[in-house]
Amino acid sequence: MGIDAGNTSSKVVIFDLYGKMIATAATPSMHFKRRGEGFEEFDVTELWNLISVCIKEAVEKAAVAPEQIAGVGVTSFGNGVVFLDKEGYAIAPGCFSQDYRANSIIEMYQREGTYEKINDIVKGTLFAGEPGPILRWYKENYREIYDQIGGILQFKDYIMYRLTNVFATDLNCFGGAFMVDMNTMDYSRELMDLYGIPELYDALPKLATEPTEIVGTVTKEASEITGLAEGTPVAAGMMDILACLVGAGATGEEVYTAVAGSWCINETHSDRIIPNASSNMPYLKKGEYLNCSYTGASGSNYEWFTRILGGTAKLEAQDRNLSQYAVLDELIEMVPIEKVKVFFSPFVAQPSIHMNAKANFFNIDMSTSYAEICYSVAEGVAFIHKHHIDFLRNAGLPVKEIRLTGGTAKSHVWNQIFANVLQVPIVGVDCEETGAQGVAIAAGIGAGVYKDYEDAFEKAVKVKEPVLLDDSTFPIYEKRYKEWCQLNEIMKTYWDEKSKG
């Protein structure tokens, strides 16, 4: 079983040993109404309750004895934070990774000269949605909550805690959340001092060194709630970034993974620390790093667009008995890209490229069609992925193939746009839930079902034919990408002014 708790939705999937999904269940990951600028929160206990219902539903749908489920793996959105008291109860809303209330803390670290010191230890680029800045923000603004904190977890770790009653995380997840000294691959009092939260060092969970490590087993109480068999092994798992890579089998040389889900994730692996990367987190092999460039600006823009501006497509979809996304794909596909004038900056969910960036449409006039606006959103998302992938390429990490995962990977239209914008073959996998598959594979290895990752990939990961490139579009996209970058550069002054109120 793989559990993938995302920013938008949470999924539970049961796979057979050959990667076939035999049962699934899902629930929206409900966001609270914003209590303040930059707040992106959720009810920790309620989301666990919803996921536990999904676990039970998946077990029942699978029509197999619970004892036949060899193991459970868990992943979730990385970063953000879950606060527990000393008794293990959630004492405040959890924070999603898009939460940026702690921008002021980042600015404070930069003024104090702390920012670069932290980045040097964690081997990444600290941003406001990481646990350290959020915890410091609570210390400065909600001391009554901060003083009760007895445990710090990522949400995937909270799910494991509710399943096993074991307070643990894994090296990849907490390394990616910048809570680990990447020089020692362990916790660091110096790092906690730099964050300004030294008193929380003892609130850090047990650190499993491998995603495949069995950290505990399903308790009697969790068994009664979820329908899983008591004693079922639960693996340490990994952050969703790595889980999607594993689920896509993208461990080969010069193979990138692009996750076009709520976040814009772009990653590969090497034996090098890449300066100024979003993160260089612990990878599957010692001595190698997961080199990442990412931002909270991908499929979340499309989700917003369909909710706020997708009414026309929704009505047509109802008339034709199609999905709203199928109608939008048709609209996008009919747009002649050489005539497109509209641009979209895809920063609805979180700032990217610039700390104060917001989403914008540019160049709309009376001749602009609804289809062109739809197209500009898809292209804008592809452009932000290009921005990050180019960073990794320019750092000396070559790419010959990109495995595209996430919600937008289900669309052949989006696959084609990505391939032509990036000028790299896009290869999909025959699994719509690669994050869940990635941690299911880890659990399978931990439980002894697979010998190792290579054995699991050979048996469980099915790769599709690559999307063919249309090189006639390359000059058009190169020109439009250059203009898109220029527009964002021009907007920086305005964004900064607006951020001051």
Predicted segments with their positions:
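Active-site core segments that coordinate phosphate-bearing ligands/cofactors
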Residues: M1-G2, L17, Q110-T125, P133-A168, ...
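N-terminal glycine/serine-rich phosphate-binding loop of ATP-dependent small-molecule kinases
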Residues: M1-P93, Q148, S223-E224, L228, ...
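Gly-rich Lys/Arg/Thr-decorated short loops/hinges at beta-loop-alpha junctions or inter-strand turns
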Residues: S29-E41, K117-I118, D170-G175, E199-P205, ...
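Short beta-strand-loop/turn "lid" adjacent to the catalytic site in phosphate-handling enzymes
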Residues: E60-F96, T125-G129, M160-D181, L207-T212
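Carbohydrate-associated surface elements
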Residues: D99
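Gly/Ser-rich phosphate-binding catalytic loop and adjacent alpha/beta segment
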Residues: A102
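Active-site metal-coordination/substrate-binding segment of hydrolases
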Residues: I105
